[in-house]
A protein has these predicted regions:
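Surface-exposed loop/turn motifs in large extracellular/passenger domains
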Residues: 1-24, 28-49, 53-72, 79-104, ...
Length: 201
Protein backbone atom coordinates (compact mmCIF):
# COMPACT_ATOMS: atom_id res chain seq x y z
CA UNK A 1 0.00 0.00 0.00
CA UNK A 2 0.92 3.66 0.16
CA UNK A 3 1.75 4.00 3.89
CA UNK A 4 2.93 1.53 6.55
CA UNK A 5 3.15 2.68 10.17
CA UNK A 6 4.96 0.64 12.78
CA UNK A 7 5.49 3.46 15.28
CA UNK A 8 3.57 6.69 15.83
CA UNK A 9 2.20 9.17 13.30
CA UNK A 10 0.29 12.23 14.46
CA UNK A 11 -1.61 13.16 11.30
CA UNK A 12 -1.93 11.97 7.71
CA UNK A 13 -3.89 14.07 5.20
CA UNK A 14 -4.46 13.78 1.47
CA UNK A 15 -6.43 11.98 -1.19
CA UNK A 16 -5.66 8.31 -1.77
CA UNK A 17 -6.53 7.09 -5.26
CA UNK A 18 -5.93 3.72 -6.90
CA UNK A 19 -3.43 2.35 -4.41
CA UNK A 20 -3.08 -1.39 -3.97
CA UNK A 21 -1.39 -4.09 -1.92
CA UNK A 22 -0.89 -7.80 -2.42
CA UNK A 23 -2.27 -8.45 1.06
CA UNK A 24 -3.68 -5.82 3.47
CA UNK A 25 -4.26 -2.06 3.62
CA UNK A 26 -4.39 -0.58 0.14
CA UNK A 27 -3.52 2.94 1.30
CA UNK A 28 -2.67 2.59 4.99
CA UNK A 29 -1.49 -0.35 7.10
CA UNK A 30 -1.29 0.58 10.78
CA UNK A 31 0.73 -1.53 13.20
CA UNK A 32 1.27 1.29 15.71
CA UNK A 33 -0.52 4.47 16.77
CA UNK A 34 -2.05 7.17 14.56
CA UNK A 35 -3.66 10.45 15.61
CA UNK A 36 -5.78 11.06 12.52
CA UNK A 37 -6.13 10.01 8.90
CA UNK A 38 -8.03 12.41 6.65
CA UNK A 39 -8.85 12.55 2.97
CA UNK A 40 -10.82 10.80 0.27
CA UNK A 41 -10.19 7.15 -0.52
CA UNK A 42 -11.06 6.26 -4.10
CA UNK A 43 -10.65 2.93 -5.89
CA UNK A 44 -8.03 1.39 -3.63
CA UNK A 45 -7.84 -2.38 -3.40
CA UNK A 46 -6.13 -5.39 -1.84
CA UNK A 47 -6.37 -9.15 -2.15
CA UNK A 48 -7.08 -9.73 1.56
CA UNK A 49 -8.16 -7.19 4.21
CA UNK A 50 -8.95 -3.48 4.10
CA UNK A 51 -9.12 -2.02 0.60
CA UNK A 52 -8.23 1.43 1.97
CA UNK A 53 -7.25 1.08 5.66
CA UNK A 54 -6.09 -1.89 7.74
CA UNK A 55 -5.67 -1.44 11.51
CA UNK A 56 -3.73 -4.33 12.99
CA UNK A 57 -4.22 -6.34 16.17
CA UNK A 58 -4.55 -4.09 19.28
CA UNK A 59 -3.25 -1.00 17.47
CA UNK A 60 -4.84 2.46 17.63
CA UNK A 61 -6.21 5.05 15.21
CA UNK A 62 -7.84 7.99 16.97
CA UNK A 63 -9.84 9.29 14.02
CA UNK A 64 -10.49 8.57 10.34
CA UNK A 65 -12.35 11.13 8.22
CA UNK A 66 -13.17 11.29 4.52
CA UNK A 67 -15.26 9.61 1.87
CA UNK A 68 -14.67 6.03 0.80
CA UNK A 69 -15.72 5.32 -2.78
CA UNK A 70 -15.21 2.20 -4.88
CA UNK A 71 -12.64 0.48 -2.68
CA UNK A 72 -12.54 -3.31 -2.63
CA UNK A 73 -10.88 -6.23 -0.86
CA UNK A 74 -11.20 -9.89 0.13
CA UNK A 75 -12.90 -8.67 3.35
CA UNK A 76 -13.54 -5.12 4.55
CA UNK A 77 -13.86 -3.32 1.23
CA UNK A 78 -12.85 0.06 2.71
CA UNK A 79 -11.76 -0.49 6.34
CA UNK A 80 -10.68 -3.62 8.22
CA UNK A 81 -10.18 -3.17 11.97
CA UNK A 82 -8.48 -5.57 14.37
CA UNK A 83 -7.49 -2.90 16.87
CA UNK A 84 -9.21 0.22 18.18
CA UNK A 85 -10.54 3.21 16.24
CA UNK A 86 -11.89 6.25 18.07
CA UNK A 87 -14.21 7.47 15.32
CA UNK A 88 -14.91 7.25 11.61
CA UNK A 89 -16.70 10.04 9.74
CA UNK A 90 -17.54 10.10 6.05
CA UNK A 91 -19.71 8.44 3.45
CA UNK A 92 -19.15 4.91 2.13
CA UNK A 93 -20.28 4.57 -1.48
CA UNK A 94 -19.91 1.58 -3.77
CA UNK A 95 -17.29 -0.29 -1.78
CA UNK A 96 -17.35 -4.05 -2.13
CA UNK A 97 -16.05 -7.52 -1.44
CA UNK A 98 -16.44 -9.99 -4.27
CA UNK A 99 -15.43 -13.54 -5.08
CA UNK A 100 -14.06 -16.35 -2.99
CA UNK A 101 -15.85 -18.76 -0.68
CA UNK A 102 -16.42 -16.18 2.07
CA UNK A 103 -17.09 -12.44 1.72
CA UNK A 104 -17.67 -10.09 4.67
CA UNK A 105 -18.02 -6.33 5.18
CA UNK A 106 -18.52 -4.50 1.91
CA UNK A 107 -17.45 -1.21 3.53
CA UNK A 108 -16.33 -1.92 7.13
CA UNK A 109 -15.20 -5.14 8.83
CA UNK A 110 -14.68 -4.93 12.61
CA UNK A 111 -12.96 -8.15 13.63
CA UNK A 112 -12.91 -9.33 17.24
CA UNK A 113 -10.68 -12.30 16.48
CA UNK A 114 -9.86 -12.75 20.17
CA UNK A 115 -12.41 -13.82 22.77
CA UNK A 116 -10.45 -12.07 25.54
CA UNK A 117 -9.50 -8.68 24.05
CA UNK A 118 -12.19 -6.36 22.68
CA UNK A 119 -11.81 -4.57 19.37
CA UNK A 120 -13.67 -1.26 19.39
CA UNK A 121 -14.83 1.37 16.93
CA UNK A 122 -16.32 4.07 19.14
CA UNK A 123 -18.62 5.57 16.50
CA UNK A 124 -19.24 5.80 12.77
CA UNK A 125 -20.94 8.87 11.26
CA UNK A 126 -21.85 8.78 7.58
CA UNK A 127 -24.09 7.24 4.95
CA UNK A 128 -23.65 3.79 3.45
CA UNK A 129 -24.84 3.68 -0.15
CA UNK A 130 -24.54 0.86 -2.67
CA UNK A 131 -21.95 -1.22 -0.85
CA UNK A 132 -22.05 -4.99 -1.25
CA UNK A 133 -20.59 -8.42 -0.61
CA UNK A 134 -20.88 -11.19 -3.18
CA UNK A 135 -19.32 -14.62 -2.82
CA UNK A 136 -19.65 -18.31 -3.38
CA UNK A 137 -20.83 -19.78 -0.08
CA UNK A 138 -21.08 -17.67 3.07
CA UNK A 139 -21.39 -13.87 2.81
CA UNK A 140 -22.55 -11.23 5.30
CA UNK A 141 -22.65 -7.51 5.97
CA UNK A 142 -23.21 -5.69 2.70
CA UNK A 143 -22.08 -2.46 4.37
CA UNK A 144 -20.87 -3.36 7.90
CA UNK A 145 -19.70 -6.65 9.42
CA UNK A 146 -19.11 -6.76 13.20
CA UNK A 147 -17.90 -10.12 14.47
CA UNK A 148 -16.86 -12.06 17.57
CA UNK A 149 -15.59 -9.94 20.48
CA UNK A 150 -15.89 -6.66 18.55
CA UNK A 151 -17.95 -3.57 19.37
CA UNK A 152 -19.17 -0.54 17.44
CA UNK A 153 -20.56 2.01 19.88
CA UNK A 154 -22.96 3.69 17.46
CA UNK A 155 -23.63 4.32 13.79
CA UNK A 156 -25.24 7.58 12.70
CA UNK A 157 -26.32 7.64 9.07
CA UNK A 158 -28.48 6.17 6.35
CA UNK A 159 -28.19 2.72 4.75
CA UNK A 160 -29.38 2.74 1.15
CA UNK A 161 -29.23 -0.02 -1.48
CA UNK A 162 -26.57 -2.17 0.14
CA UNK A 163 -26.72 -5.92 -0.37
CA UNK A 164 -25.31 -9.33 0.47
CA UNK A 165 -25.47 -12.04 -2.19
CA UNK A 166 -24.28 -15.65 -2.25
CA UNK A 167 -24.06 -17.59 -5.49
CA UNK A 168 -25.99 -20.84 -5.82
CA UNK A 169 -28.89 -22.50 -4.06
CA UNK A 170 -28.42 -23.33 -0.39
CA UNK A 171 -25.61 -20.86 0.19
CA UNK A 172 -25.89 -18.28 2.96
CA UNK A 173 -26.23 -14.49 2.65
CA UNK A 174 -26.88 -12.43 5.79
CA UNK A 175 -27.27 -8.75 6.60
CA UNK A 176 -27.79 -6.80 3.41
CA UNK A 177 -26.86 -3.63 5.31
CA UNK A 178 -25.37 -4.77 8.64
CA UNK A 179 -24.36 -8.05 10.23
CA UNK A 180 -23.43 -7.85 13.91
CA UNK A 181 -22.73 -10.41 16.61
CA UNK A 182 -23.01 -7.75 19.35
CA UNK A 183 -25.49 -5.08 20.38
CA UNK A 184 -25.25 -1.93 18.28
CA UNK A 185 -26.91 1.50 18.42
CA UNK A 186 -28.23 3.25 15.32
CA UNK A 187 -28.67 7.00 15.86
CA UNK A 188 -30.41 9.67 13.80
CA UNK A 189 -28.16 12.60 14.70
CA UNK A 190 -29.04 16.17 13.73
CA UNK A 191 -31.32 15.09 10.88
CA UNK A 192 -33.70 13.62 13.52
CA UNK A 193 -34.34 10.47 11.49
CA UNK A 194 -32.43 7.90 9.50
CA UNK A 195 -33.34 5.62 6.65
CA UNK A 196 -32.73 1.98 5.86
CA UNK A 197 -34.07 1.47 2.38
CA UNK A 198 -33.40 -0.85 -0.54
CA UNK A 199 -31.01 -3.12 1.35
CA UNK A 200 -31.37 -6.83 0.61
CA UNK A 201 -29.96 -10.35 0.65
Amino acid sequence: GAVYNGGRIENVAGNFIGNQSGQDGGTFYNAGTVGSIGGNFLGNHVSRYGGAVYNDDRDQIDNISGNFVGNYAGSGGAIFNRGNIGGISGDFIGNYVSGGTFAYGGAVYNDGNSQTVSRVIDHIRGDFIGNYVAGGYNVAGGAVFNYNNAFIGSITGNFLNNYSRAAGAGNVALGGAVYTAKKMTFAAGEQKTYFMSGNYT
